[in-house]
């Protein structure tokens, strides 16, 4: 009996640990969220840019059918009406094709999975299904009123029962303790695993009981080996648990069976790179700041929600210089699994994605997309994703600061970065890099053996002469062994 119990516990521990494995292909380290992109466009991006440039994965918008709402706001994607795979991003056939093409390009797909709730808006869905909020009925699943928690408003963030059993923003709250509800959620998740996805961002995980989620995750299938995953590989789960401290639900409740989106990360870096906290304080960046252990955390500067509704601490594409610097720091630092944002420009918070033409099946307007077709953003994202890949497996070394708003650090003998928010850096800094000339990948690129930007010389003692002006557009430089002149 004792041996059986031990074996069961070991099996559960292995299962939970596997759900923290991001399933990246070797040599790749960063997820990009292609928010509201069409499936066909994502497939092309995987083949033509993300795969060749070393990106590890794509987080896609919710693929489940949602209610069609008024002016088609972005948030209608978070109002599921069924688990049919039919949205304005494309149908199931297009989704399946995209997943296969991206996997073939070495880029994994992570689904934004919404199963805390169903739609708060009665009406017709993107695939023609219907729902009625008043009796809490989603006949296309089907769910009936008995599958939901009783109506109450989620408004007391000191009370875990209120947070997890009441309706968030009027959204009918599913009861994940019920076997039937679990089974319907599992049908949805397992179908996506069959199609070849590598994992899930779990929307509103904070509003579901950890014990229920642990059961659901544990019953999701192993990943599909037809898509290049090793036998027995588990889906990667990263959970939306907004925890900035002082509430009744803690992010630590969710780390036993998956990773967690670390919201404190972007808030603190946003403050730092806007000059509200001196950069030199980042020397001990990580759990000492109240962050999760790095193996438990998926980190980001901004997301689709707080781009629009976040505090002044949140950096977005609308604050280009500090935003790029914060992204650069995130991708240069070894902490956490990194995720970057590719969104669209917007003038008001509810604004949906751009198109050319009268319907959402028309070709998207590339000029309104940020981090995709916009070549300036592609440059920063591409080179720093490449930097992270080049320095993988190394730790922080040779930390330097001026005691205020200038910092620099190495990644072992593989790379080195420097940042300034105030004043110029002109002088020798210690690195662990081999002697030679290196191309600053932020100001230029290595092309036919020459650097189109700054060249940084490292002597035989590892000393690098760094010149970085506080007036430069990007505010930082980066060199690594893969960009040696």
Curated annotation (Swiss-Prot):
Does the record carry Oxidoreductase as a key word?
Answer: no
Taken from the record, one Pfam family name reads Alpha-amylase
Q: How is the cofactor bound?
A: Binds 1 Ca(2+) ion per subunit.
Q: What is its main location?
A: secreted
Which InterPro entries does the record cross-reference, listed alphabetically?
Answer: A-amylase/branching_C, A-amylase_C, Alpha_amylase, Glyco_hydro_13_cat_dom, Glyco_hydro_b, Glycoside_hydrolase_SF
Entry's EC annotation: 3.2.1.1
Q: Which residues carry this modification: Pyrrolidone carboxylic acid?
A: 19
| Active-site residue list | 203 (nucleophile), 240 (proton donor)
What is the reported tissue distribution? Expressed in larval and adult gut.
Q: Binding residues for Ca(2+), per the UniProt record? A: 116, 164, 173, 207
One of the protein's GO biological processes: digestion
Q: Which cofactor does it need?
A: Ca(2+); chloride
S-S bridge residues: 46-102, 152-166, 439-451
Q: Which residues does the annotation list for site: Transition state stabilizer?
A: 305
Q: How does it assemble?
A: Monomer.
**Entry similarity comment:** Belongs to the glycosyl hydrolase 13 family.
The name of this protein is Alpha-amylase
What is the source species? Phaedon cochleariae
